Amino acid sequence: MESQKQIKVNTADLEPSMYVARLDRPWTETPFLFQGFFIRNQDDIEALQHHCQYVYVDFEQSPKEITHTKTDVSRENRTITQITSLHYAKPHTTASNRNRTVYVNSQPVEKELSVARTVYAEANQAVADLITKLEVDGRLDVQIAKETVEPMVESVLRNPDAMIWLARMKKYDSYMYHHSVSSSIWGITFGRHLGLDKSALHEIGLGCMLFDVGKTKLPHALLTKADQLTKTEWHVMRNHVDYSVNLLEGAGGITERIISMVRSHHERHDGSGYPDKLKENQIPTFAKIAGMADCYDAITSTRPYSKLRSPYEAVREIYSWRGTLFQAEVVEQFMQVVGVFPTGSLVELNSGAVAVVIAQNEARRLKPRVMLILDENKKRLPQFNTVDLLFDTHLKGAENLWIEKCLESGAYGIDPQELYI
């Protein structure tokens, strides 16, 4: 039954700027990645026409001048100032893609986890030791970091989902330690997705691990302040980039590519970043990768002045910065890494069961592997079984199993950080 705000519209009558709230079929049977989106252009209309006969348009969210009785062709070129979701993924092919290294998972996530747990724990301890030593004698031991990154790269190459799972399950006794390791994991994983060679992955992992070492030169009270920073405090905080670069240059054994990566990882596509206000192609590629890894991990972490947001919320927020804070193509590729329902997300299936996403299916991002936590009656299961939504299509009467919606962190009292497989 149609509501007053959601009107059934034939796809032949769609216009740019309309907000598509529902389809005439399950979202998972289409390539539209998010459930609900604004129509941006004719390409979006043609994609909808290809997959659907009709859709439901929410006219409260659509611009007021749009009606469902008349199509105004002149509005086809209207600029959409707010796109709230990534919705349609097209193949991304460039000349450089032909030279990229193609990596294939060589271990299932469950098997890789047994190794990754040790690697992750040792990495966190190594970073803690490195920071402690730096604070005591002012010397940055780069060799510790290099030896730490090596097994992290190897684990990500075998199966990135294991390290991603552990990064998502991180504890918060020290944000700085865990953020360094987790950002390194995301940077390596992103580089793997882009097809960079192993040497480049080592550089990215090392740069992401060390890009915040300059914060050891900042007042502890500033780093742990629970309120938003003042303008003066923010200016002081920004100095950590220069401190990090100076420490790396003084330590030796660091490539120029890593130095430029660390210096520019807070630069933004529109020129609003720091310290040099670089924009667009002025920003080094490795810095773009590091900036994305840093941003995503920060959003999904508990910080002194900000509570964590779910991976799904982080994806939506980062996508809203597409073309402004971050280069559009970089965002789109990173979305392919984290998935529509990122690892660690709490989700509700169409059966009513509640699960946590534990791994991605690269071929079908809408069909990840999940671990069942609650049954269809929201009762905690005695055993947490894993289900591959791409292949395990029959469960408790759900003839075709899919993710119905993403849940907020902490829904039904579930803390994903306490779950292990």
Show where each model-derived region lies.
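Membrane-cytosol interface segments
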Residues: 1-140, 396-421
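Histidine- and acidic-residue-rich, metal-dependent catalytic cores
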Residues: 113-421
